Amino acid sequence: MRYPIRIAFAVAALALFAADPASAHHMMGGKLPQTFTQGLLSGLGHPVIGLDHFAAIIGAGIIAALIGRGFAPVLAFTTAMIAGVMLHVARADIPAAELLVGLSTAAIGLLIVLRSGFGVLPVAILFALTGLVHGYALGESIVGAENTPLGAYLAGLLVIQSLIAAGAFAATRFVAARGVSFGSVAVRTAGAAIMLVGGAAAAMAAGLAG
């Protein structure tokens, strides 16, 4: 088995242990953020401790680099993510949100693996829908918070996700610049890892693993 494929399967194995939908949205140990600082730290931490969220935003950065049209996928994802958080805060209901989070993450990975022609509008729509369900899931830990920690939480989410996506964008461009063949293998391997992380999260949400 080729080394990059081993990496992809190693990430998938990690996902089975780390992508716990219940724990991935409680940066403050299950406690509601009460201050600006707590809200900010919670927002900064959630996309990192939730492996499915982390993988999805990396995927947004990779696809942004591949389509060559700037940060459209990232902007679509982050904007819709804020809307998703606010939907949860408003007590709206998105059925099977955790399952949708996993499936949407897997779809992003599959899109990277296939690398068929990316249309900006279809990609933006995909990431808007993905961001909505991811934001809804992330909003679980902030429901009931006052405006100050809520605003700080949203700011933290925007900052950390923008940084993660920018890093993935830069890494993809750097890898691609080293040669078409190497870039293709590396990018597809990353896509496979993202797809497997999403699949593992979806399986856990559906009660098929864990």
Regions found by a protein language model. Name each.
Residues 40, 44, 78-82, 99, ...:
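Residue-level signature of the transmembrane alpha-helical core
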Residues 87-98, 113-118, 140-147, 208-209:
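Membrane-interface helix caps and helix-loop-helix hairpins in membrane proteins
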Residues 44, 54-64, 112, 123-131, ...:
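Generic transmembrane alpha-helix signature in multi-pass membrane proteins
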Residues 61-98, 147-175, 187:
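A small-residue-rich subset of transmembrane alpha-helices
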Residues 24, 50, 106, 132-134, ...:
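Divalent metal-coordination and catalytic microenvironments
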Residues 1-52, 203-210:
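Histidine-/acidic- and/or cysteine-rich, low-complexity loops and terminal segments associated
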Residues 12, 186-206:
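Final/C-terminal transmembrane alpha-helix of multipass membrane proteins
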Residues 53-61, 104-113, 159-172, 195-197:
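Hydrophobic cores of alpha-helical transmembrane segments in multi-pass inner/ER membrane proteins
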